[in-house]
């Protein structure tokens, strides 16, 4: 039995790509720039009492806004401006800022802080409110991300994703690491380290767990890792191969791809490892399941038509309704991912000898390539649906890249120092 038959299409590609290259002290630095031709000018003053902090909150806020590609940071000078100060909004508008942020960090002892800020619209000459956040030495970065999220939503009308997290796999020498980081690639933590490959990380809807496939027992087994406690447990160790975990929207069930009876088929299993149930009933390879946001459908890859294409079936399985083909642009399509609003389908299409990220409008069926890279894999939507994170190759290296989901700007390579990184998954909004 071939490796493709054993693991399905994506597991084959992932296990090959993740084995190529190595990383030494790799760190992901996320950069998403040039997203729009019009950027919102904003000035964020230094917060009062920031001196001596292990993390400068205003630096994090400015970096987040700039990285989104939606904002231009106007120089606010070096003088701290607390949220209680009287602000001349007209003067800031004259400096080119359409919004202004002021704030303070109050030291409460024992490494505890209270962060207050206020956001102003300098055009309408009015306050847009603010937040009061509690933080400690280790959560100052999170507080900065939350402030940037507030600004993003108030000024653009879309919820920000700066406080979300990423997961990805880095290979360092002969060791694989599943890492969890902030959305900017900083503050990375190692969730699992192994001498065997790790693939297919998938975030739970709550953002507290990650399911993944580990080869540490010399075969692919699906695990769930509880991030707050560090505890992990097997979810699927069936006969043959276990791969491609995908969470249901309620977090109670995972769809998995198993070769339990020969060719890889899709099953569902409870998140505690019980209740195994077969969902597809074909003699072909069915793999890479992904739930629609409303939980009604499972999208998956199958070669039942002769070559890999994306199909959709009821979440209860083919016994509840026949699977229907979804992709018709291109002869080889894999790795389905549905946007959080259920309107878009991201997938990988083989075109011109390479593999490119496509996005399809699920209502009209219109599909377009949105990248200029040629070895794309593992697409993952941001929680607000505005960006897609994916793995590709650039300059002979395995890298991550991010691109607007509407294709309005070229993809930006995420800088990884000295190494190979793959298998990205963008986490949900934190609850």
Swiss-Prot record:
Keyword DNA-binding: no
Alphabetized UniProt keyword annotations: Cell cycle, Cell division, Periplasm, Signal
InterPro entries named among the record's database cross-references: 6-blade_b-propeller_TolB-like, PD40, Tol-Pal_TolB, TolB_N
Pfam families: PD40, TolB_N
Signal peptide as annotated in the record: 1-26
Any one GO cellular component localisation term in the record: periplasmic space
BP GO annotations: cell division; protein import
Highest taxon of source: Bacteria
Predominant location: periplasm
SUPFAM superfamilies reported for this sequence: TolB, N-terminal domain, Tricorn protease N-terminal domain
KW Cell cycle (keyword) present: yes
Cellular localisation: Periplasm
Region annotated Disordered, chain positions: 411-431
Protein family (similarity comment): Belongs to the TolB family.
Subunit: The Tol-Pal system is composed of five core proteins: the inner membrane proteins TolA, TolQ and TolR, the periplasmic protein TolB and the outer membrane protein Pal. They form a network linking the inner and outer membranes and the peptidoglycan layer.
HAMAP family: TolB
Role noted for this protein: Part of the Tol-Pal system, which plays a role in outer membrane invagination during cell division and is important for maintaining outer membrane integrity.
Protein name in UniProt: Tol-Pal system protein TolB
Natural source organism: Burkholderia multivorans (strain ATCC 17616 / 249)
């Amino acid at each position: 039995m071939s490796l493709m038959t054993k693991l399905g299409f994506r597991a084959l590609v992932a296990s090959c790509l993740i084995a190529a290259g190595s990383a030494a002290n790799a760190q992901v630095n996320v950069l998403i720039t040039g997203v729009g031709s019009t950027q919102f000018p904003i000035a964020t003053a230094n917060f009062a009492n920031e001196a001596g902090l292990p993390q400068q909150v205003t630096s994090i806020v400015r970096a987040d806004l700039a990285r989104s590609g939606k904002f231009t940071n106007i120089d606010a000078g070096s003088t701290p401006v607390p949220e209680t100060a009287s602000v001349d909004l007209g003067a800031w508008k004259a400096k080119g800022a359409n919004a202004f942020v002021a704030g303070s960090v109050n030291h409460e002892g024992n490494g505890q802080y209270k962060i207050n800020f206020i956001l102003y619209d300098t055009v309408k000459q009015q306050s847009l409110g603010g937040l009061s956040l509690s933080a400690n030495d280790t959560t100052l970065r999170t507080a900065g991300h939350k402030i940037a999220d507030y600004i993003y939503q108030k000024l653009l009308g879309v919820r920000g994703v700066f406080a979300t997290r990423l997961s990805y796999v880095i290979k360092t020498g002969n060791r694989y690491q599943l890492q969890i980081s902030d959305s900017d690639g900083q503050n990375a933590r190692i969730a699992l380290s192994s001498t065997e490959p790790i693939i297919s990380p998938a975030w739970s809807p709550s953002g507290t767990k990650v399911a993944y496939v580990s080869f540490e027992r010399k075969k692919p087994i699906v695990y769930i890792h509880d991030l707050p406690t560090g505890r992990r447990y097997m979810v699927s160790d069936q006969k043959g191969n276990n791969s491609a975990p995908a969470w249901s929207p309620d977090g109670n069930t995972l769809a998995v791809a198993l070769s339990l009876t020969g060719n890889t088929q899709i099953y569902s299993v409870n998140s505690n490892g019980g209740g195994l149930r077969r969902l597809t009933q074909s003699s072909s390879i069915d793999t890479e399941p992904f739930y629609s946001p409303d939980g009604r459908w499972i999208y998956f890859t199958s070669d039942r038509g002769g070559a890999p294409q994306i199909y959709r079936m009821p979440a209860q399985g083919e016994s509840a309704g026949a699977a229907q083909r979804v992709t018709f642009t291109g002869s080889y399509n894999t790795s389905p991912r549905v946007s959080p609003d259920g309107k878009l389908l991201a997938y990988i299409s083989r075109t011109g000898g390479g593999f490119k990220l496509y996005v399809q409008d699920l209502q009209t069926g219109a599909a377009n390539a949105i990248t200029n890279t040629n070895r794309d894999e593992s697409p993952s939507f941001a929680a607000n649906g505005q960006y897609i994170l994916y793995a590709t190759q650039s300059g002979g290296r395995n890298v991550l890249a991010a691109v607007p989901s509407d294709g309005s700007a070229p993809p930006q390579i995420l800088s990884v120092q000295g190494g190979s990184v793959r298998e990205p998954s963008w986490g949900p909004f934190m609850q």
